[in-house]
């Protein structure tokens, strides 16, 4: 049982870490592409900014879902009998 709990804790930490890493990379790419687009066509800045914040909000949901799944596996572990 202790081995199972330890492995679940490690798996949850990896799940949360990779979710946060992917989101950080996504935010970096999103911000860079936004700046490139605004530099090319400044008149579209308000429309692009609205879309950027919408996508950023959706992108931010990924680590929150990962944290929820990780906490579920830690506290309500279905693998322990």
Swiss-Prot record:
Membrane-spanning residues: 7-27, 55-75
Example GO molecular function: lipid binding
Matches recorded under CDD domains: ATP-synt_Fo_c_ATPE (cd18185)
GO CC entries: plasma membrane; proton-transporting ATP synthase complex; proton-transporting two-sector ATPase complex, proton-transporting domain
Domain of life, source organism: Bacteria
Major subcellular location class: membrane
InterPro entries per the UniProt record, alphabetical: ATP_synth_csu_bac/chlpt, ATP_synth_F0_csu, ATP_synth_F0_csu_DDCD_BS, ATP_synth_F0_csu_sf, ATPase_proteolipid_c-like_dom, F/V-ATP_Csub_sf
Membrane topology per record: Multi-pass membrane protein
Site, as annotated: Reversibly protonated during proton transport: 60
PROSITE patterns cross-referenced by the UniProt entry: ATPASE_C
Coiled coil: none
Record key words, sorted: ATP synthesis, Cell inner membrane, Cell membrane, CF(0), Hydrogen ion transport, Ion transport, Lipid-binding, Membrane, Transmembrane, Transmembrane helix, Transport
Keyword Membrane (UniProt): yes
Subcellular location: Cell inner membrane
SUPFAM superfamilies xrefs: F1F0 ATP synthase subunit C
Gene3D superfamilies, per the entry: F1F0 ATP synthase subunit C
Family: Belongs to the ATPase C chain family.
Function according to Swiss-Prot or TrEMBL: F(1)F(0) ATP synthase produces ATP from ADP in the presence of a proton or sodium gradient. F-type ATPases consist of two structural domains, F(1) containing the extramembraneous catalytic core and F(0) containing the membrane proton channel, linked together by a central stalk and a peripheral stalk. During catalysis, ATP synthesis in the catalytic domain of F(1) is coupled via a rotary mechanism of the central stalk subunits to proton translocation.
NCBIfam families: ATP_synt_c, PRK06876.1
Oligomer and partners: F-type ATPases have 2 components, F(1) - the catalytic core - and F(0) - the membrane proton channel. F(1) has five subunits: alpha(3), beta(3), gamma(1), delta(1), epsilon(1). F(0) has three main subunits: a(1), b(2) and c(10-14). The alpha and beta chains form an alternating ring which encloses part of the gamma chain. F(1) is attached to F(0) by a central stalk formed by the gamma and epsilon chains, while a peripheral stalk is formed by the delta and b chains.
Name by which UniProt lists this protein: ATP synthase subunit c
Gene source species: Acinetobacter baumannii (strain ATCC 17978 / DSM 105126 / CIP 53.77 / LMG 1025 / NCDC KC755 / 5377)
């Amino acid at each position: 049982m202790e081995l199972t709990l330890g492995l679940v804790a490690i798996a949850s930490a990896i799940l949360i870490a990779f979710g946060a890493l992917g989101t950080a990379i996504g935010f970096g790419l999103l911000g860079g592409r936004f700046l490139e687009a605004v530099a090319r066509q400044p008149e579209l800045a308000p429309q692009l900014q609205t879309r950027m914040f919408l996508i950023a909000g959706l992108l931010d949901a990924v680590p929150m879902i990962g944290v929820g799944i990780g906490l579920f596996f830690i506290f309500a572990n279905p693998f322990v009998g």
